[in-house]
């Protein structure tokens, strides 16, 4: 019989008596019942009577004191043994109040720990600390030094007599040192230390340490007998260091410049405007204002020539001023206005006009520069520019501050201008027209022409653009569409450089530019040569048109279908024949495209056009529009299933995607080349709406799907692929044919033949010098198409076959 464990006894090994109080036992064990106060007493009494059993109780004996004589007496019933929990409770405390088996509480009695008046009940960190003075001074470092000195001396010592003498000397020195220390402590206030005394004391101390290394017979009792005052010296006053000068050293700290963590870009893009930036050493960003004029290789030469011309003009102008002064003096003093006749006055006026023309045309005077300084340009409201002179007109208009470009003010970003897309502009005399797209204004996403007045009202009222920024925005739109026409750089091609320095007075009198060109230096012109002027003028003339980027645009058409025509710009000035040729090419191109384009009607069999069987209706393949139409018809029919012909794996996947969009179940049927898709209606198909967005995406992808279980007739395949393969080859080669056998001889017009004939070659001769000429008959190259050997020709094959037949 198997052994029963202890836990079976509590499950019905013997019946227990009902306990008093409320309720009774429930279940199999007494621990699960809700009996009275003394439930399970008979069981505990029976188990306690067994030898070696513990009395299991959580009530401490004798208030937790094991030395209590009443410990064995229980308040409720007598205890025969001490339980294990009682001892644990005595040393470590209750489980509910303290940690389980805490060693910190093992040294405390349980009853003492509960007593609040007991001083030992406080924690160790809260108890007071008591300090007790030691009987002797504890100096382990000094003892360690002496022990090491004795050990080293014992290893080196050989003669004990010398050691004894040294020990006596060490004792004498130690007594002297002790006397000095005691005297120093008594007369500490009257002693002043110098640097020499301190050095001597340090030397004596080192000497005493050296002597102590040689001593090995001094006992520890001699050291302990010395008092602390004799061993240690306390300097209460310290050294007087006020008399020593202190050097002040000033160190300049160089602060390291911290690099900025911001990445710098030299181009700032605001809309379609690019601004070049630069950064200095202090990480400050500024606008890089570079000159707009492009550098030219002859720039320095031209500038030097103009400077020399100006210098010579200044020299000549001084001479003219002197002559003018003399003439004015003579006219003012000798010839008063009252004495002159009318004819003489006219002659003087002519002479003055002549001199004035020479000065203004040939020589720039100071009055011209003054007039240029007084001139200024003003801009009116109607976009017209007027030039005013301070000296000529008394009413001076103030310069109108130019508004900054669009995108440089915060007001420009308060409006969302991305809603308006301007694609073209038509410039007019007063107003412009804009070709723009704006859903907020037109209600669609197509481009429309709009005049400037309506466009400005939309910007100010709907987009809430400030009125003062409308002009800047319109200028920004215009600059983005119409490129700025940079003025051409001066070519100076119309300024001839004269070879002689002598000029007639008649040439100076006329307002011609030749007077300016006469100031050039003759020596430099001779050195540079005659062709330098032409080279400079030619290079400057075509400098701007050398690297020009031409915009490429698609052809513009009008009309649809057969009425589609080509739009040609009127600025090209094409004749009627050219226009007709272009239109004919366009129509031919459209016809070829229409022939190549395959429609969904091309895949449907005309005999089975209304059939429900797709295998008969589409004998060779599908167009993607055919697949969509079949799904639409399948939704309207009463049929529950429909099978598609076998297609390639990608085509089957496309049909599965179409079925998912129409909420139809799809499954594969068949094997190999006969694998096709079968679709079936479900409950969701009737009540759900198809996903036409996904269907539209599928129709824009692969257009044609051909069947893989049937083959098309050869005639249809040839017609379809005839345009792709191109024309057939015109030349064919045969086995054993000589390459170039029927080629004509190289004519005498050939350059290579002429060169050979000049070198002495004639037709029929070999190439090379006399005595070392090459072959006269060229080597013939034959065509080899078969896999037989090089010497195995077609004639040999024929002869071999005939001989074999003869042998048989």
UniProtKB/Swiss-Prot annotation:
Keyword Zinc-finger in annotation: no
The organism's taxonomic lineage, starting at the top: Eukaryota, Fungi, Dikarya, Ascomycota, Saccharomycotina
Keyword line: Cytoplasm, mRNA processing, mRNA splicing, Nucleus
Boundaries of every R3H domain copy: 621-683
Species, as recorded: Candida glabrata (strain ATCC 2001 / BCRC 20586 / JCM 3761 / NBRC 0622 / NRRL Y-65 / CBS 138)
Entry similarity comment: Belongs to the SQS1 family.
Biased composition (Basic and acidic residues): 39-48, 153-179
Protein name, entry field: Protein SQS1
Biased composition (Basic residues): 1-20, 28-37, 782-791
PANTHER family: G PATCH DOMAIN CONTAINING PROTEIN 2 (PTHR14195)
Protein localization: Cytoplasm; Nucleus
Domain of life of the organism encoding this protein: Eukaryota
């Amino acid at each position: 019989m198997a052994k029963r464990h202890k836990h079976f006894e509590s499950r019905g090994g013997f019946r227990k008596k009902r306990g008093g109080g409320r309720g009774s036992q429930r279940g199999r064990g007494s621990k699960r019942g809700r009996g009275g106060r003394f439930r399970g007493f008979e069981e505990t009494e029976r188990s306690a009577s067994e030898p070696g059993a513990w009395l299991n109780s959580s009530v401490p004996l004798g208030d937790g004191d094991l030395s209590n004589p009443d410990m064995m007496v229980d308040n409720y019933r007598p205890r025969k043994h001490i339980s294990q929990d009682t001892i644990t409770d005595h040393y470590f405390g209750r489980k509910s109040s303290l940690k389980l088996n805490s060693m910190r509480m093992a040294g405390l009695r349980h009853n003492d720990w509960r007593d609040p008046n007991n001083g030992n009940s406080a924690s160790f960190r809260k108890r007071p600390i008591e300090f007790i003075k030691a009987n002797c001074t504890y100096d382990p470092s000094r003892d360690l030094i002496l022990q090491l000195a004795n050990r080293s001396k014992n290893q080196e010592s050989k003669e004990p007599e010398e050691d004894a003498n040294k020990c006596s000397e060490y004792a004498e020195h130690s007594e002297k040192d002790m006397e000095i220390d005691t005297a120093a402590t008594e007369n500490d206030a009257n002693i002043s230390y110098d640097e020499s005394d301190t050095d001597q004391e340090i030397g004596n101390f080192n000497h005493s340490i050296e002597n102590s290394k040689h001593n090995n017979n001094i006992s520890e009792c001699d050291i302990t007998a010395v008092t602390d005052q004799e061993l240690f010296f306390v300097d209460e006053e310290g050294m007087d260091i006020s008399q020593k000068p202190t050097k002040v050293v000033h160190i300049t700290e160089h602060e390291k410049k911290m690099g900025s963590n911001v990445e710098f870009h030299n181009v700032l893009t605001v809309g379609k405007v690019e601004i070049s930036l630069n950064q200095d050493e202090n990480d400050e960003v500024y606008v890089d204002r570079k000159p707009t004029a492009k550098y030219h290789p002859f720039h320095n030469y031209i500038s030097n020539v103009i400077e020399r011309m100006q210098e010579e003009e200044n020299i000549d102008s001084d001479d003219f001023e002197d002559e003018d002064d003399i003439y004015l003096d003579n006219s003012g003093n000798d010839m008063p206005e009252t004495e002159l006749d009318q004819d003489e006055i006219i002659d003087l006026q002519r002479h003055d006009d002549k001199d004035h023309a020479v000065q203004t045309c040939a020589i720039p005077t100071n009055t011209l520069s003054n007039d240029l300084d007084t001139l200024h340009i003003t801009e009116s409201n109607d976009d017209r520019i007027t030039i005013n002179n301070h000296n000529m007109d008394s009413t001076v208009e103030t310069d109108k501050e130019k508004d900054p470009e669009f995108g440089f003010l915060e007001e420009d970003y308060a409006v969302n201008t991305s809603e308006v897309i301007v694609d073209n502009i038509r410039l007019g005399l007063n107003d412009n027209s804009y070709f723009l797209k704006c859903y907020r204004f037109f209600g669609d996403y197509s481009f429309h022409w709009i005049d400037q007045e309506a466009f400005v009202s939309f910007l100010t009222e709907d987009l809430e653009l400030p009125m003062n920024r409308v002009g800047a925005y319109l200028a920004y739109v215009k600059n983005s569409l119409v490129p700025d026409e940079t003025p051409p750089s001066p070519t100076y091609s119309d300024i001839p450089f004269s070879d002689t320095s002598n000029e007639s007075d008649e040439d100076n009198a006329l307002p011609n530019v030749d007077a300016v060109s006469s100031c050039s230096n003759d020596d430099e012109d001779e050195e540079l040569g005659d062709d330098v002027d032409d080279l400079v003028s030619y290079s400057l003339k075509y400098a701007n048109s050398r690297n020009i980027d031409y915009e490429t645009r698609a052809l513009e058409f009008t009309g649809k279908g057969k009425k589609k025509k080509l739009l040609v710009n009127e600025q090209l000035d094409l004749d009627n024949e050219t226009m007709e040729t272009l239109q004919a090419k366009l129509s031919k191109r459209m016809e070829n495209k229409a022939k190549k384009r395959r429609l969904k009607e091309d895949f449907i069999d005309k005999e089975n056009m209304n059939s429900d069987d797709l295998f008969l209706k589409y004998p060779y393949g599908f167009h993607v529009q055919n697949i969509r139409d079949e799904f639409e018809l399948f939704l309207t029919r009463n049929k529950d299933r429909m099978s598609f012909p076998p297609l390639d794996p990608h085509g089957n996947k496309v049909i599965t995607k179409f079925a998912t969009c129409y909420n139809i179940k799809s499954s594969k049927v068949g094997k190999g080349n006969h694998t096709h898709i079968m679709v079936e209606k479900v409950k969701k198909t009737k009540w759900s709406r198809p996903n036409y967005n996904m269907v539209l995406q599928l129709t824009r992808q692969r257009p044609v799907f051909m069947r893989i279980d049937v083959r098309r007739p050869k005639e249809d395949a040839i017609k379809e692929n005839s345009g792709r393969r191109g024309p057939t080859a015109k030349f064919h080669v045969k086995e054993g044919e000589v390459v170039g056998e029927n080629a004509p001889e190289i004519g005498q017009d050939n350059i290579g033949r002429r060169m050979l004939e000049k070198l002495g070659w004639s037709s029929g001769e070999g190439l090379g010098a006399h005595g070392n000429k090459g072959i006269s008959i060229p080597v013939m190259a034959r065509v080899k198409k078969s896999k037989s050997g090089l010497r195995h020709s077609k004639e040999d094959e024929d002869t071999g076959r005939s001989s074999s037949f003869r042998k048989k």
